[in-house]
């Protein structure tokens, strides 16, 4: 059941992206519930800024706000051209990709850019070309019928390896 009435009132503030040694970049995230959950998960792991492609859902969408459970007021979401961002930062780029190496076999640094694509389309081909290391979360065994993990779940698993 959807809530009735106002969910939250936000004063939309424009922030300046801080220079960090670690960035989460989201490519084409269209599901508001996923973006809200990602914002909440990022806050849990101490990440206070996220970069989204310009074709991602608006972070002030009511479903994003609801799913973020208040984290949107503490995690800043920026919209940018991802290719330009990657070129500007000149950092090692990881990409969550079903065809990548097992994340538990990859030496993952606590720095760089992590790119996550939408569940339905993955990371855009032009961005895939910029990725230095594709990483996947393997199934526990090949008999598992589920095709993939939910995007926020994948992000949470990877962040737990990097940030804890």
Spans of features found by a protein language model:
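Structured adenosyl-cofactor binding patch, chiefly the S-adenosyl-L-methionine
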Residues: 8, 43-45, 59-73, 125-164
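Gly/Ser/Thr-rich helix-start
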Residues: 6, 37, 71, 96, ...
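Conserved beta-strand segments that form the floor/walls of ligand-binding pockets within enzyme
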Residues: 7-9, 24-25, 51, 114, ...
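RNA substrate-binding interface of SAM-dependent RNA methyltransferases
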Residues: 14-99
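Active-site/ligand-binding-proximal alpha/beta "capping" segment
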Residues: 95-145
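Short basic, glycine-rich beta-strand/loop surfaces that mediate nucleic-acid
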Residues: 5-9, 68, 111-117
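Short, surface-exposed amphipathic charged segments that create phosphate/polyanion-binding patches used
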Residues: 1-2, 89-94, 108, 150
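Extended, non-globular alpha-helical segments
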Residues: 1-17
